[in-house]
Every structure is written in C-alpha cells, then in structure tokens.
Amino acid sequence: MGIKTLIIFFHIFILAVLSSNNIILTSGAEIKKFSYDHCFHLCVAGEYGSNECFVDCAQKGFWHGDCANRTEKDPIRCCCYN
C-alpha cells in the first residue's frame, strides 16, 4: 500500500467521523415539553389531525396545538399550549 492510498483512507476516515458526529448532534434536538392541562378533542387519523388541532387552539387563544398523549396507553388528544 502506498503513502497516497494511506492518506486517502485517512481522509475518508476523518470525514466519516465528522459526519457521524453531525448526525448525532442533529438527532439530539430538544423536544418541547408542554402541559397536558389544555387537551380537548380526540385526534382521529383522516378526520381530526394536527392541522385541525392547531386551528382550534389558535381560535381558543393559544399559540400552538398538536395531537399528543402522555403515555402510549392514553388516547391521542389535541393539546394546546403557548
């Protein structure tokens, strides 16, 4: 193996390490937590989803709204928050 081949593999290795670090950093995005005190309507796929929830929450004076549940066993509801 020549010196050029070693240098090429070294650069590929460095690029791979740098790329994997970026993936880890971007996948660690912080999830915004909100209170479940303002959960109203059940979300049903194809009938009442995130868009409808957002509109309803905006009409109630909230800045945000999305379909969420506290645990996997709980039903998914439209929860509003600021």
UniProtKB/Swiss-Prot annotation:
Record has DNA-binding as a keyword: no
Signal peptide stretch: 1-28
GO CC annotations, alphabetized: extracellular region
InterPro entries cross-referenced by the UniProt entry: Defensin-like_dom
Keywords for the protein's UniProt record, in alphabetical order: Antimicrobial, Disulfide bond, Fungicide, Plant defense, Secreted, Signal
Disulphide linkage map: C39-C80, C43-C67, C53-C78, C57-C79
Gene Ontology biological process terms in this record: defense response to fungus; killing of cells of another organism
Compartments, record wording: Secreted
Similarity field: Belongs to the DEFL family.
Protein name per its UniProtKB record: Putative defensin-like protein 48
Organism: Arabidopsis thaliana (Mouse-ear cress)
